[in-house]
Regions:
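Positively charged n-region of N-terminal signal peptides that target proteins for export
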Residues: 1-4
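Bacterial N-terminal signal peptides
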Residues: 8-17
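N-terminal activation segment of mature serine protease catalytic domains
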Residues: 22-51
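Conserved catalytic-core segment of clan PA serine endopeptidases
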Residues: 26-33, 52, 76, 81-139, ...
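C-terminal subregion of chymotrypsin/trypsin-like serine protease catalytic domains
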Residues: 31, 56-79, 83-89, 181-198, ...
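Solvent-exposed loop/turn segments at secondary-structure junctions
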Residues: 45-47, 68, 74-76, 112, ...
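A conserved glycine-rich beta-strand in the N-terminal activation segment of trypsin-fold
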Residues: 46-65, 123
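Chymotrypsin/trypsin-fold serine protease catalytic domain
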Residues: 124-128, 132-219, 257, 264-268
Length: 275
């Protein structure tokens, strides 16, 4: 809860949270070392005691020794607020103990909040960003970019794996439900539902829709803190999309989920320019 209060102190992130942006894994399972190239995007903010402390902001995927792929609304926040940027690949992020790698955040040039169709103006178009790390992180395997327009070939109900460091449950009783953040890498299985619906700007299928957790109904999906995390194909390395947002409702993180497609040519070209 402390982290949420600190981050929501800025108007920018408060607007994103109110819109349902910035998603965590519900009803999933610990990832362990299944996807070691999925990391936590971390920054530093001033705490209630006036001291600077590291906080976990979003999730993402290392696609080369120095390029970390995440959501645009995550890097936009860091850029606008001129905050320090770090990435951790520890299975569980522990403030003050986890190893951090510093980097520079970048935002897709076509990213735009307020450019959505009527009724969903807050929708973040081209919600993709990268962090270029100051030092290379060597791993045996990295996440990989998809081929162009791969999502268009997926069959409805195709299984996808979502991974992230976000909330995995909610504390109930005594008022509004409060998210519980384990700050650990988790994974879950979701299903592809298509590219049509609230998540698309007029004439552009820039997002893909997946089954959400159906909070309280046993489904698996994303929630606060999973933003920027990958949606993997069966090979567990191909990032077809990054978690973007879920519609607001009386029950938080109840799905469906929406993810920014990475397979679009305009996205692939921009991300590849950093490789």
């Amino acid at each position: 809860m402390r982290r949420l209060i600190l981050l929501m102190a800025t108007m920018a992130l408060a607007i994103l949270m109110a819109s349902g942006v910035a998603q965590a894994i519900i009803n999933g399972e610990p990832d362990g070392n299944m996807h070691p190239y999925v990391g936590a995007l971390v920054t530093e903010v001033e705490g209630e005691d006036g001291q600077t402390e590291p906080v976990l902001l979003c999730s993402g995927t290392l696609i080369s020794p120095t390029v970390f792929l995440t959501a645009g609304h995550c890097t936009e926040f860091l850029i606008q607020e001129d905050l320090p940027t770090y990435v951790s690949f520890d299975t569980t992020f522990v403030p003050g103990q986890s190893e951090l790698v510093s980097g520079t955040p970048y935002l897709h040039p076509d990213y735009c909040v307020g450019c959505g169709p009527p009724g969903v103006k807050w929708l973040p178009g081209y919600d993709v960003g990268v962090v270029v790390l100051d030092e290379p992180v060597e791993m045996e395997t990295y996440g990989t970019l998809p081929s162009a327009n791969l999502v268009d070939t997926l069959q409805k109900r195709s299984p996808l794996t979502v991974v992230g460091y976000g909330a995995n449950d909610f504390a109930t009783g005594g008022g509004a439900q409060q998210p519980i953040y384990p700050d650990s890498r988790q994974m879950a299985t979701t299903e592809y539902l298509g590219t049509q619906g609230i998540a698309n700007q007029v004439g552009e299928d820039v997002f893909m829709k997946t089954t959400g957790s159906g909070m309280g109904q046993g489904g698996e999906g994303t929630c606060y803190g999973d933003s920027g995390g990958p949606l993997f194909l069966d090979d567990q390395t191909t990032v077809v999309a990054v978690t973007s947002f879920g519609p607001t409702s009386a029950i938080p993180c109840s799905g469906p989920d929406y993810a920014q497609r990475v397979d679009l040519q305009v996205v692939l070209e921009w991300v590849s320019s950093f490789l």
